[in-house]
Amino acid sequence: MQSYKYDKAIVPESKNGGSPALNNNPRKGGSKRVLLICLDLFCLFMAALPFLIIETSTIKPYRRGFYCNDESIKYPLKVSETINDAVLCAVGIVIAILRIITGEFYRIYYLKEKSRSTIQNPYVAALYKQVGCFLFGCAISQSFTDIAKVSIGRLRPHFLSVCDPDFSQINCSEGYIQNYRCRGEDSKVQEARKSFFSGHASFSMFTMLYLVLYLQARFTWRGARLLRPLLQFTLLMMAFYTGLSRVSDYKHHPSDVLAGFAQGALVACCIVFFVSDLFKTKTTLSLPAPAIRREILSPVDIMDRSNHHNMV
């Protein structure tokens, strides 16, 4: 007699003994999805909390003195800025988010790429991950910037023009002057103590470098070899010009801009390579192995087959 044994792929069981497909609880999955989204929003809020506290409160920067013969803080105050805060935020955020939306829709609609997210709609899931990572990086970058500004309190190039100290009450022969009184508007004086490091340089470098790395990961069309590098270098030149304009506007020292570039680039690289999945290798799910029939022979069958081969 011959008997057959089937080896079947083992399906992992859930806690109550059944397969995952049979134990899929929609209500439990929905509550877990909401919990994860709330956790992400909480993390985003905590990342932006230092920035929000410093910008909306009366926290004053460190009060630093000066030298009377310091030429680096004697520049005039320019009323107009080459790139103001509104333009910086609008261009940096809008361009990046629009490009991310376009890239993710193309990836899902035309390339038919799937997502393992708990969010069922693939478009919403992709935008949630990529835009969420970008906004998280913006919050981290701005929090770093504001912490440095209030902690160091470096004087801007136009500090003396804004402060307008009474030099008749100051003895410049003492060298470093710490006891002085500013006759200028207090809000402008406090802002003139936030030179290091440049927020425009750090924000523009973060947004543009993040978009450069996003294009490197998502722009896979090989039709025009120089199109992607052209777009990437254009974005970097926009960030570079933004930082340099702060020097010509007498808002920052050159070292402030360089430090801002370095901080923005560092945060962008950390977010792209350690937080997002842009450059992570995608693993494919392997299908269960088919059932394999193995023939089990009894001792009598083995002897019969042996005799048959000997006769042949």
UniProtKB/Swiss-Prot annotation:
Pathway: Lipid metabolism; phospholipid metabolism
Chain positions found as Phosphoserine: S19
Alphabetically ordered keywords of this record: Cell membrane, Endoplasmic reticulum, Glycoprotein, Golgi apparatus, Hydrolase, Lipid metabolism, Membrane, Phosphoprotein, Transmembrane, Transmembrane helix
Record field: transmembrane: 34-54, 86-106, 124-144, 195-215, 227-244, 259-279
Motif residue range(s): Integrin-binding motif: 183-185
Membrane disposition: Multi-pass membrane protein
Sequence motif Dityrosine basolateral targeting motif, location on chain: 109-110
Known tissue expression: Detected in epithelial cells of intestinal mucosa, lung, liver and brain.
Region span, Phosphatase sequence motif II: 197-200
PTM statement from Swiss-Prot or TrEMBL: N-glycosylated. Contains high-mannose oligosaccharides.
GO BP terms, alphabetized: Bergmann glial cell differentiation; blood vessel development; cell adhesion; cell-cell adhesion; cell-cell adhesion mediated by integrin; ceramide metabolic process; gastrulation with mouth forming second; integrin-mediated signaling pathway
SMART domains: acidPPc
Region (Mediates interaction with CTNND1): 276-312
Active-site feature positions: H200, H252
Main location: membrane
Site feature (Stabilizes the active site histidine for nucleophilic attack) residues: D256
Record's comment describing the protein's domains: The integrin-binding motif mediates the binding to integrin alpha-5/beta-1 (ITGA5:ITGB1) and integrin alpha-V/beta-3 (ITGAV:ITGB3) and is required for the function in integrin-mediated cell-cell adhesion.
Job description of the protein: Magnesium-independent phospholipid phosphatase of the plasma membrane that catalyzes the dephosphorylation of a variety of glycerolipid and sphingolipid phosphate esters including phosphatidate/PA, lysophosphatidate/LPA, diacylglycerol pyrophosphate/DGPP, sphingosine 1-phosphate/S1P and ceramide 1-phosphate/C1P. Also acts on N-oleoyl ethanolamine phosphate/N-(9Z-octadecenoyl)-ethanolamine phosphate, a potential physiological compound. Independently of this phosphatase activity may also function in the Wnt signaling pathway and the stabilization of beta-catenin/CTNNB1, thereby regulating cell proliferation, migration and differentiation in angiogenesis or yet in tumor growth. Also plays a role in integrin-mediated cell-cell adhesion in angiogenesis.
Assembly information from the UniProt record: Forms functional homodimers and homooligomers that are not required for substrate recognition and catalytic activity. Can also form heterooligomers with other PLPP2 and PLPP3. Interacts with CTNND1; negatively regulates the PLPP3-mediated stabilization of beta-catenin/CTNNB1.
Protein family according to the UniProt entry: Belongs to the PA-phosphatase related phosphoesterase family.
UniProt-recorded name of the protein: Phospholipid phosphatase 3
This protein's encoding gene: Plpp3
